[in-house]
């Protein structure tokens, strides 16, 4: 579901670019905005109680935190705030590079929680699916962080 949100949002932004909205003239910027939409959606789960959303809620996410990490509930709130800050950073051109790099690091740091949850038998995305998704999110964040160079002449820049 999360991957679908990322892909659809990216395609919608790129379509807007094709229709003349200059902000979304490249795939890179459209993907940055698509990732921001995805992050707003996933971050919302960090703050809602059970039964409010079809996605995992705060308690579900706290259960995913490995035992060696202190204050699991607080860590869930913190990562939610970081995801929201990253989303804002991605849509602002002046902060996109820093946001992309920081989000890539965040995605790397969060991967052990997904591995722990899968190995602990929690109801989470299977690792064979989650690890490639996480690699994709890291790649898009780093792609968004890339600065445009003079040699960039195609619409993928």
Task: Please place each PLM-identified region on the residue numbering.
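Membrane-interface extramembranous regions
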Residues: 1-157
